[in-house]
Structure formats: C-alpha cells, structure tokens
Amino acid sequence: MAKIMIQGTASSVGKSLIVAALCRIFKQDGYSVCPFKSQNMSLNSYITLDGKEMGRAQVLQAYAAGLEPEVYMNPILLKPTSDKKSQIIVNGKVYGNSTAMEYHNLKIKFKGMLKEQFKKLEEDFDIVVMEGAGSPAEINLRDRDIVNMGMAEIVDAPVLLVGDIDKGGVFASLAGTMLLLNEGEKERVKGTIINKFRGDVEILNPGLDMLEDIIHIPCLGVVPYTRLQLEDEDGAVEFNKKAYAPIDIAVIKMPHISNFTDLDALKSEEDVSIRFITSKEEFKEPDLLVIPGSKNTIEDLLYLRKCGLEESIKEYSKDGKIIGICGGYQVLGSKIKDPYKVETDLGEIEGLNLLDMETTFEKEKITTRVSAKLINEEIENIVYGYEIHMGISEYSENVKPLFKIYDKNGEKVDYFDGAINEKGNVMGTYIHGVFDGIVFREKIINELRVKKGLKKKKSQVYEHMREKELDKLADIVRQSLDMEKIYSIIGMK
C-alpha cells in the first residue's frame, strides 16, 4: 500500500482540501483510496451510519474518495468546550473531558491504537492520503506528537508541506518550518506546495527557485486561489459574498458555535446570501434568522443576553422567521437545566422563552443518524440528518412537533423531534444536516420567496453539486501539481 501525508506550515493553509483533491484524483485514476487524520480538533462533527462521531473534514475527503465516512478515517476528535478543556472522542465515542496537559499525557496511550487502525487501511486500500494538523514545527509538542511528523514516523509516510501564499510570508513560513524540523523529519519532506495563489505564476518562479536553493526541496506546484462551494470546518468560516441576493439569512455567530456546516446547503441557493452577526447593530432585518449549534449552550445563551442580541431576537420573533438547530433549538425554550453540571455550575438558566419547552442535560451524549418527515406532510417528504446532543427537550401543548423520526441508525422507530410555535414562525430541531436534503430547504426558502413577492424555485440536489465541486477541485489541483512526481514519491507508476 502507498501513502502520502499532507502537512502545513499553519492551520487554515488548505491541507484538508488538498487531501480531498488528491483522494478524488487517485480515485479518478482507478485506485482505491482512503483519507486519514489521526487527530482532528473541530466543533464541526458528523455521525456515521453506525452512530459514531467524527470530524467533518474527513467526511468531505471520504466523499472525494467515493467512500461512506467511517470513524477509522479520524480516530481521535477533540471538541473544545472552553479555552482550556476539550471533549475527547475516540473511535467515535466519548472518551472523556480533559485539559490540554491531561490530553498531552494521554497521547502515548493512543499511539498503539493509531498504528493498529492504520494497519487495517493498509490491507483495504491502494493509497492512503493522510492529513496533519496545524504545523509540524510545534517543537514543544514534538516528543508526543501523534498527528504530524510523529504519525508520519509511526507509518513511515513521505510528507508534502503546504504553505498559504494568500496570507503573505509563504517563503518564510516554509523555510522556517523546515528550519525547526530535526534531520529525520526533514528527510521525510519530499516536496512543497504553494496554495491559494493569485496572479501570474511567472512572477513567483524566481522565489520558488531561491526557496529550493535554501531548503533543498522541490516545489511540486502552485495551486490558484479558487472559490468553491465546499464546506469549511475551520472556526473563522467565511461564506462567499454575493453581489446581490434577495434572500437575506442572518446567523448568530456565538462564541462556541458548532456544526455551522449545517448552513452549507443554504449558501448553494443562488438567490440566498448568508451573513454572520455578533451584535445587535449587525442584526438589521433578515428574511430568516438561524441560531446554530453550540458546544456550550448555556455560555452562549449568556453571551446573547450580555451583548444585547437576546432583545433583538425577541423583537424579531414577532414577525420574523427563526430556526434553531440543536443548541440553537435549546436556547429558544423557556428553561435549560444542567443537574449534572455538564456545561457549567449554574444548574439551570432561563431561555429565550420563544418556545414553551424545557431542556435537561443528561450525562450521556446522543449520537445517531435519523430519517424523518415533516408533520402533516406526505411520507415522500423525507429529511435525513443526524443528532449530536446531551439535552432532552420536553414541550407543552402550546407547541407542536416539527418532525416525526421513523428511522434511527437503520432501525424503525416512531417519535417526534423539534418544535414549532402556534404562529409557525419560530421552530427548532435536533437534526443536523436538515437543509442538506431538498425537502426542508426548498420549503423554507420558498416561503421566504413568496413573502418577498418572488417566484418559487426548485432547489438543486446538494450532493450532486458537491460532486461537481469536488471534480472541479481535482481538475484544478491536477493541473497545478506535478502528479507524475507525486506518484513517484509514493512508489506508484
């Protein structure tokens, strides 16, 4: 089996999409290929068919490889709960909560597990495309590294180093990274990639020659800056700004926002623009307000109260349409109870009182794939998604359920999810990915169109659009990189 590892000079240099592109290229060339990231830190996660939790970046990479996402592609997921603590997910299940130092001490324990996981991939695939995290030059973490050079050493993988020229300083970041690697690590780096380039590459070439003279490693290509409608799992998410879009969707960007990939399908609608708001001054008059998921719902509710957004949301709820997802659904209720102090020591807190319901946080996390249908709609109107939450919500007779769940992890079930007020303009659900399918997305957006005097439209199938975008990404990267050299590095062709 062949393997290649993509590492970067820093976070957000484009490692994830380079891995996705290589997965699609190798697949197009007839190889069975699998993505692998030993440890990911993200608040955007996904639930597999067997009810296990993994990072969203490896989900996109799995689709690029033509695979159903599985947790062996991302054995360890860290979900920050505060500046100093994270929830640790190992092989799709909650391992526990720990501080950075506690987790640093746990890494030795996980090395053997990661090695065994990778052995299974060697048996099943022609090529594994690995992804590092942050930078391999974090010299204070070197002795227990399990995600960059430490992981490359465990499986003896060659490395390509990616630098982001769009931020500036790409030559210094590449040369500086190489300077901080030890001799064994330097030998693993077989090439560099310049990512997110704008302009004429001829102007860049002299710098590439000088860089190669300094670090003695060839540049394998320059990838142009390209806007693609593919999800971004990084915290500083930026949605494509459209020159004009009649449907304005505002999203509350809370400090602990999670699973904002729920919004990706919405931004695929041509007449929809999405903007994040962090203050009441930015609120304005949106056509739809979305309150997304949160890794710390109580802290984010306190944030809404402190910054004045609570008042804006309540005023908007008189005539505007509001959708809350997971944590955003919980804050819409009358009360959140935390008897086991899962999130804070407060015990309980008053909600926004826009839905007559109460949420209680339990000890165990619910992670499940679900299929549902809108209440009072035809059975064909199916919504697919997944749940990731520790809260159980109970509502009064003043609110109605939004969905009926009929399938849970492949088993037939019959229970309700979500809630909608009597007026029908404030609603919430635990289902992540609720907009990915056509049914609910088209229904909501068409209601907004009609309200503004616009014609109804058919929504495109998000999965089809994603496939086209992945092919486009692969074409761009194939044209930009020396693929013959990359095949030579991994010992193929």
From Swiss-Prot:
Species whose genome carries this gene: Clostridium botulinum (strain 657 / Type Ba4)
Domain of life: Bacteria
Signal peptide: none
Pathways involved: Cofactor biosynthesis; adenosylcobalamin biosynthesis
Record carries keyword Signal: no
Family statement: Belongs to the CobB/CobQ family. CobQ subfamily.
Keyword Repressor: no
Protein name per the record: Cobyric acid synthase
PROSITE patterns associated with the record: GATASE_COBBQ
A GO molecular-function descriptor: catalytic activity
The entry's keywords: Cobalamin biosynthesis, Glutamine amidotransferase
